[in-house]
Amino acid sequence: FRPALIVRTKGK
């Protein structure tokens, strides 16, 4: 899984 994906969801 890409950590960047999680960060983007958190920012949203």
Curated annotation (Swiss-Prot):
Keywords: Amidation, Amphibian defense peptide, Antimicrobial, Secreted. GO terms for biological process: defense response. Its main location: secreted. The modification Lysine amide is found at K12. One of its GO terms (cellular component) is extracellular region. The keyword Secreted applies. It is found in: Secreted. Expressed by the skin glands. Belongs to the frog skin active peptide (FSAP) family. Hyposin subfamily. Has antimicrobial activity. This is Hyposin-J1. It comes from Phasmahyla jandaia (Jandaia leaf frog).
